A protein has these predicted regions:
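N-terminal accessory scaffold of Fe(II)-dependent oxygenases
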Residues: 1-230, 238-247
Length: 247
């Protein structure tokens, strides 16, 4: 059903035109190839190993937090039947997690490994500087998400987001802020990553359990990103993010 949803609008923008386009922007849009010249994008085109090598070479010598899936073959980082998390948090050096991701590419039963919202300046040397966007006077938070093939439930964020797919492929399914009542949000005090998430499996919705989600789908948009593509996700827009490739 996601393939039948309207596509997020695409715009042709030079990197230097992004800051002006973002001023006052309140609806999502995609820019193909905005970050095509990023070193990580170029490495990713050579394959997962090249992208992982670049990240490992610039990682600081410190422990990185990672989410490790508890159930083999389950790519959703979500709740289990008892409303506990279906993953555990662990700390370790980045090469350890990258090796686990590489192993997962060859083994469909390997647990999901996901590093979420890692501050590029705190955890890497030179990575943020080499992978920036021209945002004018804005002082953005620059974070990176690294993982094996994962599926992240619909959630929202307070800041505006410009998300770039640097390696692999991603599918974003977006819902406007006012659709919160039709997304069946989970408990506010018990969340996978600090923000309430939709209890609906967007890829395979159970309309008997979540009948109002049919209304949310009437307002949904979808975008599939290739390496170097970027999407603007406005403040408070709900976004469900799915990895479509191994890394």
């Amino acid at each position: 059903h996601l393939d039948r949803l309207p596509r997020v609008a695409e715009e042709v923008l030079a990197p230097e035109a992004l800051a002006e386009r973002l001023t006052g922007a309140t609806t999502p849009f995609v820019v193909r190839g905005l970050a095509a010249d990023w070193p990580l994008v170029k490495a990713g085109r050579q394959g997962g190993d090249a992208a992982r090598d670049l990240l490992a070479a610039q990682a600081r010598n410190r422990a990185f937090p990672a989410s490790i899936g508890a159930q083999a073959g389950d790519d959703r980082l979500f709740y289990d039947a008892a409303m506990a998390m279906n993953f555990r948090m662990d700390m370790g050096p980045l090469p350890q997690w990258l090796a686990a991701m590489a192993a997962a590419e060859a083994d469909a039963t390997a647990p999901t490994v996901y590093l979420s919202s890692i501050d590029m300046g705190d955890y890497f040397t030179g990575l943020a500087e080499a992978h920036s966007l021209e945002l004018g006077a804005r002082q953005p938070l620059a974070s990176i998400w690294i993982g094996s093939r994962t599926c992240i439930a619909a959630h929202n964020d307070v800041p505006d987001n410009v998300a770039v797919c640097a390696a692999g492929r991603r599918r974003f399914t977006l819902f406007p802020p006012e659709q919160f009542a039709n997304l069946y949000l989970g408990p506010l005090e018990n969340t996978p990553a600090g923000r309430p998430v939709s209890m609906v499996d967007v890829r395979a919705p159970d309309f008997a359990a979540h009948p109002r989600f049919a209304e949310a789908l009437q307002h949904a948009q979808v975008a599939e990103l290739e390496p170097g593509d970027a999407i603007f996700v406005p403040s408070l827009w709900w976004h469900h993010v799915e990895g479509l490739a191994a890394f």
